Amino acid sequence: MNIHEHQAKQILKKYGAVVPEGVFAFTVDELIEKAKSLKTEKFVLKAQIHAGGRGKAGGVKILNTIDELSVAAKELLGKTLVTHQTGPAGREVKRLYVEESSNIDKEFYLSCLVDRASSKIVFISSDQGGMDIEEVAEKTPEKIITTKIDITDEISDADCEKIIAIYALADDAKKQAIALIKSVYKMFLGTDANMVEVNPLILTKEKKIICLDAKVNFDSNALFRHPEIIELRDLNEEDPTEIDASKHDLAYIKLDGSIGCMVNGAGLAMATMDIIKLYGEEPANFLDVGGGASKEKVSAALKIILSDKNVKGILINIFGGIMRCDVLAQGVVDAAKEINISVPLVVRLAGTNFKEGKEILDNSGLKLISAENLDDAAQKIVEAIK
């Protein structure tokens, strides 16, 4: 689950990190009234959307007076920002954040995330702050340091010094940076975060270490432990279809292709998407129905897939372990009759009761295309939509 910048900064502040003082609001009048409490020569106005690249899209402005802030806020609120992360449709700005300006001397990059390969927490640091870290990794990889921390260990001063070595800080600033690393680590563990990113992390001309921007993503599977974080969820920033899918306990992510996918198991879903690409088409979604598939769940999944107007065909790929293929097949047949599917539908079943499942599909009277294996299924759905 993602949250807004102003929310991320408040959590960082709670754990001891230093952030600029700021206020957020849903209306211009509210913003201006709150901004009067800020002690600053200049105001930094920021659009609050769940996407990076706001500055280049006109979503970050530096203003000299309250009057300038009011004019800029009126222009920005309700505007649709298009960045490299929003896609061509962009995101509408529905809340604004204004904070005190900072006297920047140097900009750094810092992030903390889970390294699944080593089962450790990894810190990524760079002296190239304010830039897209992927771009830095591609052009100047020597500018990036990665430091792995065992999740069972406390983070030490020595660990912190490794992380911040590339910043080349003087003594007092170095102490501040070490304290910040410990705060980020404590926050990461304490909130069950997947990622904490501070970009840029700055050294001011007054020699203060400050988190100038922040992005946090939380493990959705651990949110039951954090009701206070659940309250920060902004449904306006999420795809309505993905919200609907979550209500039916479906793991769904919309993509840009033309072949809808319904699969049980995340690994099999990824393999299904890969083989669709191998045969020259693009998947329209990732959809994992999980270990159980009632008629209602299959029907909901098909409706969600078909709500995407780009879908020209559907591939259902099921390996029956806990899930019985005959139960899934009956769910597909019942749902297909109810929805009246008009696009080609290829079904591949394997595993528990797959023979019974195939019989149900063959005797359904529906124009379903049966596949023997994943390779066969991918070829058939690609051919069917041509």
From Swiss-Prot:
- Recite the UniProt cofactor note for this protein: Binds 1 Mg(2+) ion per subunit.
Q: What are the binding positions for ATP in this chain?
A: K46, G53, R54, G55, E99, S102, E107
Report the cofactors.
Mg(2+)
Q: What is its EC number?
A: 6.2.1.5
The Gene Ontology terms for molecular function here are: ATP binding; magnesium ion binding; succinate-CoA ligase (ADP-forming) activity; succinate-CoA ligase (GDP-forming) activity
- Matching PROSITE patterns: SUCCINYL_COA_LIG_3
At which positions is substrate bound? N264, G321, I322, M323
- Any one Gene Ontology cellular component term annotated for this protein: succinate-CoA ligase complex
Name the chemical reaction catalysed here.
succinate + ATP + CoA = succinyl-CoA + ADP + phosphate; GTP + succinate + CoA = succinyl-CoA + GDP + phosphate
Q: Which GO terms describe its biological process?
A: succinyl-CoA metabolic process; tricarboxylic acid cycle
**Binding residue positions for Mg(2+):** N199, D213
**Sequence ranges assigned to domain ATP-grasp in this UniProt record:** 9-244
Q: In which pathway does it act?
A: Carbohydrate metabolism; tricarboxylic acid cycle; succinate from succinyl-CoA (ligase route): step 1/1
Keywords tagged on the record: ATP-binding, Ligase, Magnesium, Metal-binding, Nucleotide-binding, Tricarboxylic acid cycle
The keyword Nuclease is annotated on this UniProt entry: no
On assembly, the entry states: Heterotetramer of two alpha and two beta subunits.
Question: What is the annotated role of this protein in its UniProt record?
Answer: Succinyl-CoA synthetase functions in the citric acid cycle (TCA), coupling the hydrolysis of succinyl-CoA to the synthesis of either ATP or GTP and thus represents the only step of substrate-level phosphorylation in the TCA. The beta subunit provides nucleotide specificity of the enzyme and binds the substrate succinate, while the binding sites for coenzyme A and phosphate are found in the alpha subunit.
Q: What protein name applies here?
A: Succinate--CoA ligase [ADP-forming] subunit beta
The record lists the lineage as: Bacteria, Pseudomonadati, Pseudomonadota, Alphaproteobacteria, Candidatus Pelagibacterales
Recorded name of the encoding gene: sucC
